[in-house]
Amino acid sequence: MQRIFHLDFNFLMLTKEEIRRQLDAVAAMGYNAILWELEDKVRFETIAPCIHPEALSKEEFAEILAYSRSLGLEPIPLLQTLGHGEYVLGHEDFVPLRELPEWKDCYCVSKPAVRNLLSLLIEEYLDLFGDIKSFHLGGDEAYSFAQCPVCAAKAEKIVLQRKARGDQRQDHQVSCSGDRGRCQEGG
């Protein structure tokens, strides 16, 4: 059975030593996987202007990953893809990628630049994490999702299509094949 510990760097920057102590404690408690929510705490080139001043280099984080693996902790990267975009969308270079100009929490997925940014960031994560079994693409708390005119029209069209065929489901499914995230939407 997988016992996953969520290590969230959203509001916290730990030193390498603090992270190692945390990993030691987590392994001692019987966890066997770490969900790594890194945000701006590793120096990703794709979002370079947004990086925390004390962020770890990729080399430093790779050493931490190796240590984590040596403790029997499977790494699971977590990348926020709809909401929780404040660490990127709060930066002036990325304001055009917001769902609504006045809110910095949600990406506008109708914009090709957003899909390109997230694809590049996913590639960086995959390169950094190496051989992984799982990749968590976060999509919660996207409070302004589907509110720009383009997204709202697409959402309305989907709702109308579902009603027309008698489908009342509110979920959205994405199926991915093995080729590094080549996904297809389904519903």
Task: Annotate each predicted stretch with a short phrase.
Residues 1-180:
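Feature activates predominantly on carbohydrate-active enzymes
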Residues 183-187:
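Domain-scale selection of a single, long terminal region
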